[in-house]
Amino acid sequence: EPGAWMSTNVYDGKLRRRIERNYRWSGSAWVQTNEVRFVYDGNVALQERNEFNVPSLTLTRGMDLSGSFQGAGGIGGLLALSDHKSRILDHSYFHADGNGNVTALADTNQNVVARYLYDPFGNPLSISGPKAALNRYRFSSKPVHELSGMYDYLFRWYTPELQRWDNRDPLNEVGGIN
């Protein structure tokens, strides 16, 4: 089918997504379009790397909504994003609301270069600005998967369009965390 896509993920022993591979259907076969590798500090991502393990994006984090560095899973703790993809390292700075949702990115000259507005369930109402697409860390400071629109909350995925998680609460399931 035209526009068909597929995504595969590789997880480590702590259930952190380490590699994301995206594919598009070419009409006769699946063709890999990109690969992202994640580097973590505890349970929060600090860096994204390409398939050659070269940094493409680095996140600077501070204290999250809990007042610690990872107590709220990093929600509201994003400070800066450094884009390594161009020849000149480009920095953007996060602005978030009281719930830890990223509402804007500013450049080093304090110009707003991206704005994000969400409904209460995380559906994007408005995404604007020249660098809006660069940032995948948005609702609840979590990364959104570009093809599915789902948010990675580490132990499970959230779909704002459906206003629900893709699986039951892992703590309430018998037989494991998935």
What are these regions (language model features)?
Residues E1-G13:
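Surface-exposed extracellular loop regions of Gram-negative outer-membrane beta-barrel proteins
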Residues E20-G27, F155-P160:
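Short beta-strand segments and strand-loop junctions that repeat across beta-rich extracellular domains
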Residues Y23-W25, F52, T108-N111, L171-E173:
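Acidic glycine-/aspartate-rich tracts in secreted/extracellular proteins
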Residues S28-Q32, W165:
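Tryptophan-centered short beta-strand motifs
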Residues V54-I75, L79-F155, E161:
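A motif-centric feature for acidic-aromatic and gly/ser/thr-rich catalytic loops and repeats
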Residues G176-N178:
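Short beta-strand-alpha-helix junction that forms the catalytic/metal-binding core
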